[in-house]
Amino acid sequence: MEFWQNIYSHFNPVAFNLGSIAVHWYGIMYALALLSAIFVAKWFIKHDKLAISNDLFDSYIWWAEIGVILGARLGYVLFYDSHTMYYITHPWQIFNPYINGVYAGISGMSYHGAFFGFIIASYLFCRKNKVSFWFITDIAVLGVSAAYIFGRLGNFFNQELIGRVTDVPWGIYVGGVLRHPSQIYEAILEGLFVFLILAFYRKRKTFDGQLALMYGILYAIARIIAEFFRQPDSQLGFLVGEWLTMGILQSLIILIICVGFYVVRRKIIIKN
């Protein structure tokens, strides 16, 4: 276990350099997340013979990805960044990867922001193309849940979103302190487990939107559990007592919204 506990001392968050540009493992994992989301979703479309063309779904992917990126960055700036007012008064800096003329990349993404960005982009796409919002998001969440695994692995390799202090033998040293590998917990709980449940249940769904809403519910529950092993963001800390974090608060909101929509849509289907 010694190698595992000291794993951060064995590799660099920067995978390689392209001239003056450092390519981080986080960026590589993000690219793999996008590719896996597309591959998994298209595999299910083909395997389950779903009524949607490749061209239409390819177009949807672009809309969804833009929504995810915009939502993730804006969500972080509004709820997590300690310089929120600066970005509000200098919005052009939100996506500026340069600091004083030096490339530093874009740091700070919020998954909850990405979630709502994805919803908005999906709604706008479906409205424009006259496609069922619930049908297409049922497909999308299969890919999203699989891609999430790579996203959290990216956080792990980037040595960010660290866990709380622990004495468990599988903990890892961060700055000389043994902590929970919370990013791995999240990859398993919020990614792998959710994906397996959705993949297993997809043939048993009784209405369009059931998988999408199940994803929101399952993700929120898994995230709330994982938050108890994850160190609160240093700039925010605990919002209430020593248990309520911004992640838990936002997950509770998603949970309430998705449960509400699930109950309403299920009642409509039963009534009809």
Swiss-Prot record:
One of the protein's GO biological processes: lipoprotein biosynthetic process
EC code: 2.5.1.145
Membrane topology category: Multi-pass membrane protein
UniProt pathway: Protein modification; lipoprotein biosynthesis (diacylglyceryl transfer)
Membrane-spanning intervals of the chain: 21-41, 60-80, 101-121, 131-151, 181-201, 209-229, 244-264
Domain of life: Bacteria
A Pfam family: LGT
Intracellular or extracellular location(s): Cell inner membrane
Designated name of the protein: Phosphatidylglycerol--prolipoprotein diacylglyceryl transferase
Family designation: Belongs to the Lgt family.
Described purpose of this protein according to its UniProt entry: Catalyzes the transfer of the diacylglyceryl group from phosphatidylglycerol to the sulfhydryl group of the N-terminal cysteine of a prolipoprotein, the first step in the formation of mature lipoproteins.
UniProt GO molecular function: phosphatidylglycerol-prolipoprotein diacylglyceryl transferase activity
Name of the top EC class for this enzyme: transferase
Keyword vocabulary terms for this entry: Cell inner membrane, Cell membrane, Membrane, Transferase, Transmembrane, Transmembrane helix
HAMAP family named among the record's database cross-references: Lgt (MF_01147)
Keyword set includes Transmembrane: yes
GO cellular component annotations of the record: plasma membrane
